[in-house]
Amino acid sequence: GIDMEAKFAKHMIYITNNDTPGLVGKIGHCLGSQGVNIANFNLGRDKIGGNVIELIEVDSPVDDSVLDKLTQIEDIVQVKKLNF
């Protein structure tokens, strides 16, 4: 398993990916270019170069088109929106 501390918020994005340099920046750039503001970013990984989970709190609901763009980024395995 992957250890992580995170507070759940109203609007979140759940991402799993391979641990590769620059991927967090690509995620941030993708979200920013779509007008999505990151409120909080939580990351956990099992080992260097291994599996990663991100829980990203955003200010507003995310359109499915944004999720589609995230899934096109190399090394991203899974993307889901979470609304509480």
Functional labels for PLM-detected ranges:
Residues 1-84:
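A conserved regulatory-domain signal marking ACT and ACT-like small-molecule sensing domains
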